[in-house]
Amino acid sequence: ILKGPVLFKNYESELANQLNKQEFKKSMISEDSYYTAYGETTLALKEQIEKAIMEKFNETSDVLDKIDWTDPNNAYLLYAMLKKDFTYSARFEILPAEKFNNSKTQYKYFGINEKSRPEQYSSVKVLFYNNPFDYAVALQGNNDEVILYRTNSDKTFKNLYADLTKKTEKYRGNRAFVQGDKLKIPFISVKQDIDYQALCGHEILNTDRLYIGKALNTVDFNMNNTGVKLKSEAAMSIMTMSLMPEMKKQRGRNFYFNNTFALFLKEKDKSMPYYAMRVKNMELYKYTGEIH
């Protein structure tokens, strides 16, 4: 339906430019973790999507009911769902609450301290530790990993991940998490509904007078001491214009993620992450799930 970058006639969109730069590809994630559909905007397509995501993920949609399926100008629909639910190799300790990035509020944390069991160490792979302000670890699941990169950089996620990869390749220190090392990570919840209204109502270049009627995205993310759950949906309705409106023992390292950091989710056998997040203000990510 739409091939290549989305550009508008007589309208410059910074949001569209940023989205066009994103390089997410299906090859970054296994087929059993996503579902996509597109076609003419009919109730039959809606039923097809609802049945498919229920059978594949046992999930319902948060966006399909926001599409006008009876509007005759609603020509096409593009839809995608990403679903991930995985546990770490071992359950982490629940740590005392403390501040994040000099906040007034205290937040819940999990990780590894001096009382933790040695078997928990294998759930953490050290990517690099250059100094107390520049380090990264990967929490291990069976097929996925959570990469945490301590940095204040405001670069794009693509450039952040490139920096992280270079530092990981150059690191010659101990990649094992060992006795004396400590780990501290905040519990995180994100539930976000985004309506990209700035993309709507403008004629799309190189089409037969089509425009975006709705562009919706939802994210439901939870990370705790046992694992990660992620559900994300995206839907875009395309309308016609007719009715347009190991080493010797070393000093212990503190991998404390209690200040600004970047988070990536990646399948172990893939080279690029399928999800990224920058955590700076914990009030936006305050954990709302249960703690066991």
What is each stretch, according to the model?
Residues I1-H292:
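Hydrophobic-core positions in well-structured secondary-structure elements of globular domains
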